[in-house]
């Protein structure tokens, strides 16, 4: 499926390393309507672009996730709590919030009916239990 470059693309976790690079690449490919969302304050984002919509919001909050997904035809859900080796084993409650984040973003995209494609990416910092 070819993505329409005029369709609204939502990138959650956009203030992080991978999310920031995805936003950059989508801009370079000519996508016109990008909504970048991250829980971090804008000045803490890995990279930020002033010619797109940048939003600081907490996707663990249902209303914020629904606001973020409003009108989005394509969703790249990269938002997650992470912290490297040992994080999952030592921060189970935080990991449960990542599940809540994914649930809220997915529900918002589905229930608003505009989303054609939804991409979920696991954290870059997932390790086998024996390496935690």
Listing of model-derived features with the role each one plays in the protein:
Residues 8, 73-74, 117:
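Structural motif
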Residues 7-29:
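N-terminal Rossmann NAD(P)H-binding glycine-rich loop of SDR-like oxidoreductase domains
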């Amino acid at each position: 499926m070819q993505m329409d470059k005029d369709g609204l693309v939502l990138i959650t976790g956009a203030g992080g390393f991978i999310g920031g690079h995805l936003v950059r690449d989508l801009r370079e490919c000519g996508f016109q309507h990008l909504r970048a969302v991250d829980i971090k304050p804008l000045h803490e984002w890995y990279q930020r672009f002033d010619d797109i919509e940048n939003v600081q919001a907490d996707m663990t909050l249902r209303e914020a996730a629904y606001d973020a997904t409003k009108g989005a035809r394509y969703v790249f859900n990269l938002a997650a709590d992470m912290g490297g080796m040992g994080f999952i084993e030592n921060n189970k409650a935080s990991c449960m919030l990542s599940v809540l984040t994914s649930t809220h973003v997915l529900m918002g995209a589905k229930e608003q009916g505009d989303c054609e494609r939804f991409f979920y990416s696991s954290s870059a910092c997932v390790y086998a239990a024996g390496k935690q």
